[in-house]
């Protein structure tokens, strides 16, 4: 299994949680194709809304990929994003700042936001555990 962070505004995360899906990189399929059933995805939201929301800087959802391949949906004639189905877990929105020193994927703590510019990226099991614990995710429920 691989662990991922997907950088998405909170309003888009909430839409995905309601619909049980994720998109990445403005609907492009590339990173979604790298994911496999059972992979963990943590959602980080720099803002409350896209594109002009208030700063948030929090982990806003967590779940596991629930299908085998990306699929395309038609939103409008010229916007047909790719998606993956996700089984979301109950969690609490968690600010990132108290976790920065504990997260290995943030190599330069003074420029902690840099990594999120990549949109979707892998994290190790340690970082997943730190985030999952902070989000009060109970895997036994």
From Swiss-Prot:
Q: Which Gene3D superfamilies does this UniProt record tie to the protein?
A: ph1033 like domains
User: InterPro entries from the entry?
Assistant: EVE_domain, PUA-like_sf, UPF0310
Q: Which SUPFAM superfamilies match?
A: PUA domain-like (SSF88697)
Entry superkingdom: Bacteria
Q: Which residues form the signal peptide?
A: none
Family, according to the entry, reads as follows: Belongs to the UPF0310 family.
Cross-referenced HAMAP family, in alphabetical order? UPF0310 (MF_00771)
Q: What is this protein called?
A: UPF0310 protein Mflv_0785
Q: Which organism is it from?
A: Mycolicibacterium gilvum (strain PYR-GCK)
């Amino acid at each position: 299994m691989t662990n991922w962070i997907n950088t998405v505004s909170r309003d888009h995360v909430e839409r995905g949680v309601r619909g049980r899906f994720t998109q990445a990189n403005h609907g492009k399929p590339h990173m979604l194709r790298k994911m496999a059933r059972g992979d963990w995805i943590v959602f980080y939201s720099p803002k409350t809304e896209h594109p002009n929301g208030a700063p948030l800087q929090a982990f806003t959802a967590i779940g596991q990929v629930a299908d085998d391949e990306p699929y395309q949906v038609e939103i409008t004639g010229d916007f047909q994003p790719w998606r993956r189905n996700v089984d979301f877990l109950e969690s609490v929105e968690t600010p990132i700042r108290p976790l920065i020193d504990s997260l290995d994927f943030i190599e330069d703590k003074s420029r902690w936001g840099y990594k999120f510019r990549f949109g979707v990226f892998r994290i190790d099991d340690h970082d997943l555990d730190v985030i999952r614990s902070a989000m009060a995710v109970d895997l036994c429920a």
